[in-house]
Amino acid sequence: MRSHLLRALLLAILLALPAHAHAAPPAGKLTWYGQACFLLETAAGTRILMDPFAKGIGYEIPQGFKADIVTISHEHPDHNNVAFVAGKPRVIRGLTADKKGWTRVDEKVKDVSIRNVGVYHDDQRGATRGLNTVFIFEVGGVRIAHLGDLGHVLNDAQLAAIGAVDVLLIPVGGTFTIDGLKATRVIEQLRPRIMVIPMHYKTDASTIKELESAALFLDGKQNVRKETSNTIALSPMKARPAAEIVVLPYK
């Protein structure tokens, strides 16, 4: 009898605990600086900067910026400005030095697993704008895919190589990349579990006139959340019926 009462008491205590008591610890956070530039900061303090831009495209470069690692999806100046970072970070490039092939990245750096998948900057197998790289980061049970300047919908081999995605960073501005309609198709292909963050589109700050705004991509979508901060927390969670589209400001 006493054991039954004890079990009932323990169950009541567990049920009374707030929901956040059972939540998984945060994996880290993402900050968007504009264009395709994101900073991933892990809970352990690792800082990875993706596709830093050069001066002259309208966005500000923070002074004294620190990062452990910089990833470069392709060698265009709005994506490969290593000087964005103070000091001497480790640089992981997606393309070979001659830009005619992809590097092979599949390694663990501190608490982050990093790998890459070769894709194209256009829908002509690179004939117009060259090669591009998808980088996949995994930390704390969360997989983040940064599509760089993806210029096409994905084929079966590319989809298999990318694999499961929780958080998708996807270009939507067209002209140099997929536009809003093709971005929607790529999301349908990859089926991210948690979140989609659009990037590489026209904003009030951007001086790249050829870019489209995010309006075409967002048109008709119901699951959109517009944030007031350019930083968002990352935590492992169950898959949603449809990934939430999170629009970040660039500062």
Question: Where are each of the predicted segments found?
Answer:
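A short helix->loop->beta-strand "cap" motif at the edges of active sites that frequently abuts
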Residues: T46, P89, R191-M195
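Positively charged n-region of N-terminal signal peptides that target proteins for export
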Residues: M1-R7
